[in-house]
A protein has these predicted regions:
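Alpha/beta-hydrolase superfamily serine-hydrolase fold, recognizing
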Residues: 1-184
Length: 184
């Protein structure tokens, strides 16, 4: 079962993608200069921070993208380039990072994302569109669970779009990765 969840093993040249994402994102951030607010803290650890890409004028709303990486890898720096399209269409963009497994479990990461969303919502106005990929897709879907977010934030959620999320975590309990995930 562990081999079935090893995504990278089934993608030709998988190891080439992350350096490309990092380089493209770095160039994007550098091109924005002072417009990008990098490393805005929302919690006590260094990874509990987000990058915020505001609009020069009033934004149509805020797009929040939560990265994937099996809750064990990557951070906001790898995905900055994804903000380009939303910015071009008049949306501010925020991209949080979170502590990774095995230092913390998935339940803790879920709470961290809820805190990040509350912090971002507190500094923005208008609708919020929430999206994430893979593990990030799981995390954004969890934000719709009762009690995860205050009503004032929930009322602003216009769209929640999990992209290729890990939706059923039970099979992960029987993988080698669960030593990191701490699912019971």
């Amino acid at each position: 079962l562990s081999a079935a969840y090893a995504n990278g093993a089934y993608i030709d040249g998988a190891a080439l993608y992350p350096p490309r994402w990092d380089a493209t994102s770095k160039a994007f951030r550098e091109a924005l200069g002072d417009q990008a607010e990098q490393g805005v803290s929302y919690g006590p650890s260094p990874r509990q921070a987000y990058d915020f890409f505001p609009m020069d004028q009033t934004a149509k709303g805020t797009l929040i993208f939560v990265h994937g990486g099996y809750w064990r890898m990557f951070d906001r720096d790898s995905w900055s380039f994804l903000a380009k399209g939303a910015l071009a269409r008049g949306w501010a963009v925020a991209m949080p990072s979170y502590d990774l497994c095995p230092q913390v479990g998935i339940a803790t990461i879920t709470q961290q994302i809820a805190r990040a969303l509350q912090d971002i919502a507190g500094r923005t106005e208008g609708p919020i569109s929430l999206t994430g990929h893979s593990a990030g897709g799981h995390l954004v879907a969890r934000m719709l669970a009762p009690g995860m977010l205050p009503a004032a934030v929930m009322d602003r959620l216009q769209h929640v779009v999990p992209i290729s999320p890990l939706s059923d975590l039970e099979p992960l309990c029987w993988t080698d990765m669960n030593d990191d995930f701490q699912l019971d």
